[in-house]
Amino acid sequence: MTDTLLPAAPQPLEKEGNCYFRKGCNPLAQTGRSKLQNQRAALNQQILKAMRMRTGAENLLKAATNQKVREQVRLELSFLNSDLQMLKEELEGLNISVGVYQNTEEAFTIPLIPLGLKETKDVDFSVALKDFILEHYSEDSYLYEDEIADLMDLRQACRTPSRNEAGVELLMSYFMQLGFVESRFFPPTRQMGILFTWYDSLTGVPVSQQNLLLEKASILFNIGALYTQIGTRCNRQTEAGLESTVDAFQRAAGVLNYLKETFTHTPSYDMSPAMLSVLVKMMLAQAQESTFEKVCLPGLQNEFFLLVKVAQEAAKVGEVYRQLHTAMNQEPVKENIPYSWASLACVKAHHYEALAHYFTATLLIDHQLKPGEDEDHQEKCLSQLYSHMPEGLTPLATLKNVHQRQLLGKSHLCQAVTHHEESMREASLCKKLRNIDVLQEVLSAAHDRSQLKYTQLREDDDLLNLTDAPDIVSKTEREVEIIVPQFSKVTVTDFFQKLGPLSVFSANKRWTAPRSIHFTAEEGDLGFTLRGNSPVQVHFLDPYCSAAAAGTKEGDYIVSIQDVDCKWLTLSEVMKMLKSFGQDDIEMKVVSLLDATSTMHSKCATYSVGMQKTYSMICLGIDVDDKTDKTKKVSKKLSFLSWGTNKNRQKSASTLCLPSVGVTMPPVKKKLSSPFSLLNTDSSLY
């Protein structure tokens, strides 16, 4: 006899005052960041439409045999390619819109580059999860409508996270919740029929898969992107703000590096291993730049040892940006990295190399070795400043000879002016960088300062006497490093914990439907012993006891006693409950573990518009009928994202039948419709 398991008196998941429900930002707020994200969503749709039209035109060109038709199609293809190029340039403009994310109090600092959040489409979990709960766990799916709707609300809230630690915790909580969902509802032998669609943040190309790994990888990318936006928002005019900036970019690098190492075959350009490696380098370069700004924040005194330190710190920043620019110009990254990003990396490389030469020139020209000063220390610092001294010069002789110091200092000034001019030229070649006023002002001011100092010292025979300035050895007191994400610090409650302990009740294990066992304890003896802990398992069963006669088997798991859910009860609690009935009849429900059948894994197709080469995830292929009926609950609670129009979320009916015998469904409680609802759009509002 089989029954449907009805969890009696389930423990509520709601924790009032414990931040169980989290909200995203108001998608209707017309902030600069929300407008930018709305433009990104609109551009994604335009790019998708243009790519579909181009694909259709290419197919028509292959199929057409009429020469006149082929010429018309070629003309249309040229227009479509032109439109796509313009759309990609618009998307690049959004990716370099650094002014929106910068702190408003910053007046004279070079902007940092944040990453934009990946966009997605709405996903309906309800039908697939309800079917799986009925089929796999043999439980009534209506009991889990609240939990399914909570999961969908949490996903919707993650589309508009706030730009602070609360937003990071929101994304991390959903990422960890996906781990629970994957273990409970995504078996390794089949697909669930839930299609996840995410847009590439750099190209706008959509990627769709029936694979939860795409969802998890995209959420990780957005966590890293959110850290970059937090870093650019910090006030870099204060020491605490700069420290927060360094920390945020190090954490962003850690998340992106974790994504690269964990999800190695992601089907999106922005999450490919090569692109992620470049993005990690960019985050660390910006963290190193903020470290240099922190050194310079108190003001630079015209002191020998301090100038040596600052020169080497600037050389370090220039070095990491030079390496970043080289990485951005390698295939296959070069094709998809925004040109303005690569240009800005080159600009910063020249700018900070120029600063290193300027500070070196200052310490050589403005200082002389005086009696009583630490001669050995200055000699050591100067020797460590260069990998090798210019031919014919020694550190100590240079310190003592004013003329040699002047000549070497002017050589560094010439080199500084050259790098400044190159940085300004590179910035002028990029239309997006020309529109960043603060960048132009900083580059111009630095160039004028070096040019003025050289003009004051220039002599007619400098072209004959000056030698090439040696390269400055890069050195930093604080080497920035990747901070590994710590997901364990975010406390998450499994939405579907009523299904039982995850170690036992998971998608990887197949179970029989619950069987009702009616028996009595003869003279206080149950006829079996118990073992295990949450859930309790039948052990050492007496084949002649009443429980065995009623159908109990050794190894069965006890899931309920007298309609009281026992999946989370300990052995002592279950034994105490059984003993409490004495000689009375006991109704116990048990389930048995079925042998797992091995299934050969197959690859599923990745739908990616316009991607000639794609990284394909391994997932499992079966035919799944399209489910178009979107279902949502009428929640007793406010949704995670409680802005929008008044639309009630309707409950959906499952497509599977309950394996129940003589079980009466309890009356459905009437729920009050929420005055708020999620905005249901194809692209997220931000």
Curated annotation (Swiss-Prot):
Domain of life of the organism encoding this protein: Eukaryota
UniProt keyword terms in alphabetical order: Coiled coil, Cytoplasm, Phosphoprotein
Residues covered by the REM-1 domain: 26-100
Gene3D superfamilies, per database record: 2.30.42.10, alix/aip1 like domains, HR1 repeat
Ranges where the record places region Interaction with Rho: 46-66
Protein family according to the UniProt entry: Belongs to the RHPN family.
UniProt GO cellular component terms: perinuclear region of cytoplasm; plasma membrane
GO terms of biological process kind: glomerular filtration; negative regulation of stress fiber assembly; signal transduction
Name of the protein in question: Rhophilin-2
Chief localisation class: cytoplasm
Domain BRO1: 111-460
All copies of domain PDZ, residue ranges: 515-593
Cellular compartment(s): Cytoplasm, Perinuclear region
Keyword hit for Coiled coil: yes
PTM annotation (Phosphothreonine): residues: T655
CDD domains found in the cross-reference section: BRO1_Rhophilin_2, HR1_Rhophilin-2, PDZ_rhophilin-like
PANTHER family named in the record: RHOPHILIN, RHOPHILIN-2-RELATED
Self-association state and partner proteins as the record states: Interacts with GTP-bound RhoA and RhoB. Interacts with both GTP- and GDP-bound RhoA. Interacts with KRT18.
Keyword Cytoplasm found: yes
